[in-house]
Amino acid sequence: MTYLAVRNDLQLLTARELEVLQNLVNGLCPVEIAKELFISVHTARTHVKSILLKMNAHSSLEAVSLAVRNGMLPTPLTA
């Protein structure tokens, strides 16, 4: 996927989906994302599914890789 395609895909994401994607980049799973964002696990999983559809990704890892590789989101936080 090209930089422009990823950029366009990220523009389709809602603010909340971008938050969820950033948490995926930081290594959180949907259960942890739910706790972090004060939402239900079901809602977190729904956001992840929506992100995958909009980014045409087959997994969370692929979505994270596309976003980070193309410089669309900051790299994961390191300790």
Regions found by a protein language model. Give the residues of each.
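Regulatory hinge/linker segments at domain boundaries
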Residues: M1-Q22, P74-P76
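Conserved short-loop catalytic and cofactor-binding motifs
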Residues: N8, V25, E36
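Hydrophobic alpha-helical segments, especially transmembrane helices
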Residues: E17-L18, T46-S50, N70
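Hydrophobic residues on short alpha-helical segments
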Residues: L21-V25, L52, V64
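Short amphipathic helical patch at the helix-1/turn junction of helix-turn-helix
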Residues: N23-V25, H42, V68
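Recognition helix of helix-turn-helix DNA-binding domains
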Residues: C29-E62
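Basic, Lys/Arg-enriched C-terminal extension of HTH/homeodomain DNA-binding domains
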Residues: L53-A79
